UniProtKB/Swiss-Prot annotation:
GO MF annotations, alphabetized: RNA binding
Record keywords, A-Z: Chloroplast, mRNA processing, Plastid, RNA-binding, tRNA processing
BP term (GO), one: RNA splicing
Pfam families, A to Z: Intron_maturas2, MatK_N
Known function: Usually encoded in the trnK tRNA gene intron. Probably assists in splicing its own and other chloroplast group II introns.
HAMAP family listed in its UniProt record: MatK (MF_01390)
InterPro entries, A to Z: Domain_X (IPR024937), Maturase_MatK (IPR002866), Maturase_MatK_N (IPR024942)
Keyword Ligase on entry: no
Name the UniProt record assigns to this protein: Maturase K
Subcellular location: Plastid, Chloroplast
UniProt keyword Repressor, yes or no: no
GO annotations of cellular component type: chloroplast
Amino acid sequence: MEELKKYLERDRYWQQHFLYPLLFQEYIYALAHIHNRGLNGSIFYESGEILGYDNKSSFILVKRLILRMYQQNFEIHSSNESHKNRFVGHNNPFFSKMIWGGFAVIVEIPFSLPSLIEEKKKEIPKSQNLRSIHSXFPFLXDQFSHLNYVSDIRIPYPIHLEILIQIIQSWIQDVPSLHLLRFFLYEYHNWNCFITLKKSLSIFAKGNPRLFWFLYNSYVSEYESVFCFLRKQSSYLLSTSYRNLIERTHFYGKMEHLAVVCCNCFHKTLQLFKDPCIHYVRYQGKSILASKGTYLLMKKWKCYLVNFWECHFSFWSQPYRIHINQLSNNSFDFLGYFSIVLINPLTVRXQMLEYSCLIDNTATKKFDTIVPIIPLIGSLSKAKFCNVSGHPISKPIWTDLSDSDIIDRFVRICRNLSHYHSGSSKKQSLYRMKYILRLSCARTLARKHKTTVRAFFQRLGSGFLEEFFAEEQKFLSLVLPGIPLASGSDRVYKERIWYLDIIRINDLVNYS
């Protein structure tokens, strides 16, 4: 507990008290422009074109926005007075996006400074391998084969606005910035009811992705700060890879009142969670909690999480959002793979002098990953590459492109999909995905040239679109140069291959 208090005292040093004046600096909006251009295109230029402005006038509009904000008085009014003194960008979506983007850059400052200082002090190597999504699977293969149960947790949302502001207040002590954030959230709540409607929440995330993820990560950080503390206190053996994973997936931040909460409320809880081996991984809106303990212990963790969300965040979390499965009997969805722990029975012959016997009760455990065929077909169906039963269809929206552009798009999608799911032990499903994309490409080209697929293949030959199935051959020539292609193909067909350059989930994997 003393170490936790010292850690919190150190974090308080980085609390920012003067963030609001940065909202009136032009370079803040330039930083937001550069970031959003890399993610969703330029919000300055695209919005300016929609509103009738050219590219050169975008920064003139920034100066005009700053002048208006100098004269703006941000106050929260009741619903009857909401039409008075409204947000400066309410009637202009271009101004609104600029302020959202600039404010997102400002509020990230208190979180980025401590992480940079910690990396500089500890000299953490900036290895791309640790940032790869596939780097988590070898860790799971080493640890999960010795575990018994896993809880598949869907992190509940959304959270109440005032609780969300209180969470951010522990890092940002600048009162004007907090008032401005409260004004933004309540204004958006009045316009779209983003607290109650999941569709409106997704619209908010698409329109303001950087600020949305900042708010969401702040909420998750509050939940994980207590959870990770309990996990460390309740474990006898800590994983050596735990910190490396957390440093790149966990959103930095501890709350001020964490020590008080743990002292007053959780000293009895620690006696219930004595687990020598427990692992926690979070990705997107889900998390995995695996343990070597019993089913009763996992039920206690489930009750704790439900009560914690209800008491600490003031909303009811349905128990069905947490599924407890036995690893040897059930698979769980993790980062686009179906993962399961397989039990392979072995028969061992033992011999002592002239006597021999067979021991058949020996078993080994193996962590296995396979491609989820049905969800992937659903993703291809949503993207209009096939129907719901997996029958390939044409892509009419791409028929205006050139033949080379159409082929290049299909090949790139197929290559990325094969690259991401190379860790599957059964690649029949992956070859079926390639077949769907290959035939969809042929149907799209045939639709463009107003002919049939059969006539199209007869004219171009049977070797047309062979690059869809050439990914394994390219891999063999680079990684396994000394192995013949025939035996190498069999090896790639059976072996799982993890790449260390994948830093984001494939779009077709986000089927849930």
